[in-house]
Regions:
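Short, basic phosphate-binding NTP loop
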Residues: 1-53, 72-74, 89-99
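Walker A (P-loop) phosphate-binding motif
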Residues: 37-84, 155
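Acidic, Mg2+-coordinating active-site environments of NTP-dependent enzymes
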Residues: 49, 137-196
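Residue-level preference for the first positions of well-ordered beta-strands
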Residues: 51, 108-111, 165
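Hydrophobic/aromatic beta-strand patches that form the interior of the parallel beta-sheet core
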Residues: 52, 79, 130-132, 167, ...
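Gly-rich Lys/Arg/Thr-decorated short loops/hinges at beta-loop-alpha junctions or inter-strand turns
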Residues: 72-73, 129-138
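Short, structured coil segments at secondary-structure junctions
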Residues: 74, 126-127, 181-184
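Conserved nucleotide-sensing/catalytic segment adjacent to the nucleotide-binding pocket
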Residues: 90-133
Length: 196
């Protein structure tokens, strides 16, 4: 019954926020996790196919939304945090607000943007099937100090999901290095020819 209460409360909070002109993208998730802490993991287990997470300094929201749009274009039901609310509460909101009033989720896939430092908070709730790593640059220094800190957090999260396949940007040396250093299965993507 706490799970139902958490889902209903999240939907009510989202509705109230919309009435007041606010998004409420993280508040609904925070309330759901407070009322029923295992809700994120339980809903994630109801995803029928794969869970993708997108991490990186730049391009997370665009990459995540493009992936979700491709899947939806193939008539798949997708959980996606399209607004870029990419910390634990925002991730929880994406799942909870896609759950029906029965408290259950009917989704084929999940495409979830996750802030690099939040991966270690999100992955205890569920282990993704894939991580798409866009790039790693120093523009996050204001939040995390050295880029090494960001890489250490990502490496720790990757270790928490040992079967997760890492899809890393081969054109970004830090992303490629990080993927190669892990025991996770990995593959690379990039631009194969000079475009400029």
């Amino acid at each position: 019954i706490r799970r139902l209460l958490a889902v209903w409360s999240a939907h009510c909070i989202k509705f109230a926020c919309q009435l007041t002109g606010k998004q409420g993208a993280t508040l609904a998730g925070k309330a759901a996790l407070t009322l029923y802490p295992p809700i994120l993991g339980e809903l994630a287990r109801e995803v029928k196919e794969d869970i993708f997470v997108v991490c990186g300094t730049n391009g997370k929201t665009t990459t995540n939304n493009l992936l979700a749009s491709v899947l939806e274009g193939n008539h798949k039901k997708v959980v996606c945090n399209r607004t870029g609310s990419n910390m634990l509460n925002g991730v929880a909101s994406a799942f909870v607000l896609n759950a029906g009033f029965s408290g259950h989720l009917k989704a084929d896939y999940a495409c979830i943007e996750v802030d690099e430092a939040s991966t270690v908070k999100v992955f205890p709730h569920f282990q993704p099937d894939y991580m798409i790593l866009t790039n790693l640059f120093r523009d996050q220094l204001d939040r995390y100090g050295e880029i090494d800190t960001t890489m250490e957090l990502l490496a720790k999260a990757m270790g928490m999901a040992p079967h997760m396949k890492i899809l890393a940007n081969a054109d970004d040396s830090l992303s490629a290095f990080l993927a190669l250093e892990q025991e996770n299965p990995h593959a690379f993507y990039g631009i194969s020819q000079q475009v400029i």
